[in-house]
Amino acid sequence: RGAESDHVLVLVDGVRMGSATAGLPALQDLPIDQIDRVEIVRGPRSSLWGSEAIGGVIQVFTRRNTGKVRPNVRIGVGSDSTREASAGNGGGIGRGWFGADVAYTRTDGFNACRGTGGDAANPFGAGCFTDEPDRDGYRNTSANLRGGYSFTDTLTLEANALRADGKSEFDGSYTNRSETVQQVLGTKLRYTPSDKVNLLLSLGRNDDKSDYFHDDVQSGYFQTRRYVASAQGDFTVAANQLLTAGIDWQDDRVESTTLFAVTRRDNLAGFVEYQGRFGAHQLQASVRNDDN
């Protein structure tokens, strides 16, 4: 649809994720073993989710263990000295449920680039402008905790914590290794007094940090810390007609070896959306106001 990767909002269990400086998250570091499903909304959704969603929304849901308590273990190997292992436990107990998982992935990789730093034939170099004939690997360590409890049939509390540490090696004259940290914390309180009313209060925090190195010497880093809160109500006003109203707030803070004129911003917004289905036709109308 002509949008770029930094035009898409990424949510992990409802919490906004991503770097305020790069404009997009490190999706490659999210642990696949701990993802239950991914939902994608294509097209502009800024009126509901804000300016980060002008190209769409990607919502990642981690696994929710509500059945019988059951441990799990998985081990795998592959080419390029790839090995991975994961273990976890979770399930439902009475009116509550819990889940805990850890995972580790490592591959020694291969030589990512055969470049030159400059010679008589090409004094400016070529490729990645350096000659590092080594294997460039990747490592990822992650942990995910989540749980919930239903106080009544209409009132439910959930909480989740996800952390993923990644290390990528590559060839480059300025940087040849990056280390990333992705952390998501969230809690939700849901109240559903009837099948026509759904109220949700959410709090969350996201930490995104990227460190860059050249031959084990740090060359720079970027860190974003984001706090979010929202209150939303969904109301079924008639058959196949839904009215959504809410407010959301976020506070972004940036630290880096690069000097920025502004290192903190906050945004308070209110929104209303109507969705209706009439036979083969759909109608959607929404409005949002942001104070940034």
Q: Model regions: which residues?
A:
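A short, compositionally biased micro-patch
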Residues: 1-3, 33, 41, 80, ...
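Flexible glycine-/small-residue-rich
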Residues: 2-4, 12-14, 42, 62-64
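A generic beta-sheet turn/junction motif
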Residues: 4, 64-66, 91-95, 153, ...
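Transmembrane beta-strand segments of Gram-negative outer membrane beta-barrel proteins
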Residues: 7, 36-37, 56, 62-77, ...
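Short acidic/polar hinge/loop motifs at secondary-structure boundaries
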Residues: 7, 15-42
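Short acidic, glycine/proline-rich loop/turn micro-motifs
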Residues: 21-24, 70-72, 111-114, 170-173, ...
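Periplasmic-side early beta-strands and strand-to-turn transitions of outer-membrane beta-barrels
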Residues: 46-47, 59, 66-68, 74-76, ...
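Face-selective signature of the C-terminal outer-membrane beta-barrel domain
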Residues: 148-165, 180-292
